[in-house]
Design a protein with these regions (language model features):
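Short Lys/Arg-enriched helix C-cap and helix-to-coil transition segments
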Residues: 115-122
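Basic nucleic-acid-binding alpha-helical/helix-turn surface characteristic of O6-alkylguanine DNA
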Residues: 1-99, 145-148
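Substrate-binding/gating loop at the entrance of the active-site cleft, primarily
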Residues: 80, 111-113
Length: 148
């Protein structure tokens, strides 16, 4: 089941499966494919409040779908404090493989849970805003939102 709604950073599509949100992504498509479930409505409500700086945490049920390595990276990304940034290399070191910064970048690119897994907090070695699946403007917007 999917549900799409508009936000300040673009249309967000939510995917629910088995009572959990398994995907939060920016999309070009607007509208909803079916009547939203209570969980999809709750997730939309929380995300909308988050993007208005009215909420700091999202606490609806999620399920991360990915390889064991991707899930390890995603958990490490969730440890980055709101408003802070870390480099791909620092996250590679955090998961125990200081030479895996490119693999960390690839895991970020496959992140199914925008906002829950904060890939926007990961920056290049020179602290430059690089490598965000939804573009650097969205990355900058999310980082600025978190420091307000």
């Amino acid at each position: 089941m999917t549900h799409t709604f508009n936000t300040p950073i673009g249309a967000i599509r939510l995917t629910e499966e088995g009572g959990s949100i398994i995907r939060i992504e920016l999309t070009d498509a607007a509208g909803t494919s079916s009547a939203p479930t209570p969980l999809l409505r709750e997730a939309e409500h929380q995300i909308t409040a988050f993007l208005r700086s009215e909420r700091r945490q999202l606490d609806f049920p999620i399920r991360m779908v990915g390889t064991a390595f991707q899930q390890r990276v995603w958990r490490a990304l969730q440890q980055i404090p709101s408003g802070a940034t870390r480099t791909y290399g620092a996250r590679a070191t955090a998961i125990g493989n200081s030479r895996a910064s490119r693999a960390v970048g690839m895991a970020c690119n496959k992140n199914p849970l925008l906002l829950i897994v904060p890939c926007h907090r990961v920056v290049g070695a020179n602290a430059k805003l690089v490598g965000f699946a939804y573009g650097t403007e969205a990355k900058r917007w999310l980082l600025e939102l978190e420091v307000e």
